[in-house]
Amino acid sequence: MEKDLTRYRNIGIFAHVDAGKTTTTERILKLTGRIHKLGEVHEGESTMDFMEQEAERGITIQSAATSCFWKDHQLNVIDTPGHVDFTIEVYRSLKVLDGGIGVFCGSGGVEPQSETNWRYANDSKVARLIYINKLDRTGADFYRVVKQVETVLGAKPLVMTLPIGTENDFVGVVDILTEKAYIWDDSGDPEKYEITDIPADMVDDVATYREMLIETAVEQDDDLMEKYLEGEEISIDDIKRCIRTGTRKLDFFPTYGGSSFKNKGVQLVLDAVVDYLPNPKEVPPQPEVDLEGEETGNYAIVDPEAPLRALAFKIMDDRFGALTFTRIYSGTLSKGDTILNTATGKTERIGRLVEMHADSREEIESAQAGDIVAIVGMKNVQTGHTLCDPKNPATLEPMVFPDPVISIAIKPKKKGMDEKLGMALSKMVQEDPSFQVETDEESGETIIKGMGELHLDIKMDILKRTHGVEVEMGKPQVAYRESITQQVSDTYVHKKQSGGSGQYAKIDYIVEPGEPGSGFQFESKVTGGNVPREYWPAVQKGFDQSVVKGVLAGYPVVDLKVTLTDGGFHPVDSSAIAFEIAAKAGYRQSLPKAKPQILEPIMAVDVFTPEDHMGDVIGDLNRRRGMIKSQETGPMGVRVKADVPLSEMFGYIGDLRTMTSGRGQFSMVFDHYAPCPTNVAEEVIKEAKERQAAA
């Protein structure tokens, strides 16, 4: 039976850590009848935070998916982490959502991770509501946060509710559209509220905001705009229709206030999910791509009768077994179906399908376009793989994940655990593409790489608790890069004669710095056949394979352009392998002449500190070679933004707590690579040589 997709909403809830996302999701589940006792995050018993590490730390690490119902609509809700080290979870969730709720703290306002998540949501063109939470907190200011959304995020909030009372006296909200006040009692029961007239002292404010709301909404419809300008009354249904259109187009973001912890205001946000966020048929269809990742011009149309197109967006091993969270874009997926994984070229039979509720599940027979479900027991699937109809194959646009910025060498504490460690790590890599594992060729050490200290800390925890492997960790290593600063024209001749046919290849070439972020580029300008065209790819391959190791400290070389200008060949002794060898030797010959340099990762660091500790915090950031970008004083303290080298930030959280008597907070995200100062570069090169000598 075909489902009515107009009654579906695939939504994500995302925010900065501690803005109250998971608590908001708990309230949604309570209100929609999914759970009967509310779990409090600060007590470590939240429904959505179901990994032990999450429950202990009070932060959401994995995006838990759950289905619930509100006003005859099915909501598939994904609760995402707010900590910067887990941004990958937010990114991959946004990839498969149709709409979202951005949760902001009423006192903290637009915080660092809010900005990152907002940018990702813009990139993914996800329609959003804004929910300003924690309005019962000291220092909470709804209007200030609305202004910050405009100035910091460059977004247009469409204010839909106004708070009644501030801080401790916050009791409810006014629905601007219906001009009704929702006032909750102090029992903490979300169902115990009354709908009354607007408080007398708010009548003028509500009228002003209502006029702004209607003016903004009717811009979506020329006929209604004309009626409005002529002084005609616009119906609430017409206004809602316009708000829905503008929300879907990302022209504005309906904005609500409340306190999830105190159970005030969440119902109106749920109503808005149904009223204004798009259903699966209202979002642009997913493009299909070829093997090179280029769009083919075909799209996965949201139709249960169309060929199957689905995206595996998360792999998770839980106590029930391996789960593959999947968004179905077109077609129908049923138990017993055979599907093709376009990434591996292998087919697999679907054993069981389940609809998830945090960490419990309900078996289902089939799922259709628009659904988010979990497949149990798939073998060779990874995040970003396309699952499709084997008779009508196609690949969806894959996910792109950021490179890790930190690495640590690990080894098992107990002997004989190497195999167990290897199996555990391969499973963890499958679940989290931003976590990488490799073996150091020289030392044979196992190296793990991730997005930050907390990211790797959690992985060590998972190894110990889930897989029973305790490890010793080395010192964190920074992912340095190398580049060149000068153009060099050079020639290399590879000649080898050892009886019989020899080897001969001559290349004339230019190595030069590329544009920042351009990676490795190769071009051939050979004319006249001195280097036959069939050997050009071999020259490119030789250089391409060489850039993984720089000449200063063995770090990968970035932003390098090589141009093959001329050369020579021998009709008998020349071969592709000879030209490849020439390119590799040419690389080693020319790079030292091109004034190479070490690049270090620079992090965008965002620090919050009470005002009386601001001097210490800024002085400390300067000592860490930080460049202060801005300082902003708010009611709760000062927010300092700075660019700081990653190598200077290890252990910063402990130092910040000491400086601020435990009241400071910070987050950081990779921003760019920049040349190291000479003294730092010399130290990096020295350490690299010592490591190589010890290996």
Swiss-Prot record:
Described function: Catalyzes the GTP-dependent ribosomal translocation step during translation elongation. During this step, the ribosome changes from the pre-translocational (PRE) to the post-translocational (POST) state as the newly formed A-site-bound peptidyl-tRNA and P-site-bound deacylated tRNA move to the P and E sites, respectively. Catalyzes the coordinated movement of the two tRNA molecules, the mRNA and conformational changes in the ribosome.
Organism lineage: Bacteria, Bacillati, Cyanobacteriota, Cyanophyceae, Synechococcales
Location, primary (coarse class): cytoplasm
Protein name: Elongation factor G 1
Gene behind the chain: fusA
Domain of life, per lineage: Bacteria
Isomerase as UniProt keyword: no
Location(s), subcellular: Cytoplasm
Segments forming domain tr-type G: 6-281
The UniProt record lists the keyword Cytoplasm: yes
Keywords, comma-separated and alphabetical: Cytoplasm, Elongation factor, GTP-binding, Nucleotide-binding, Protein biosynthesis
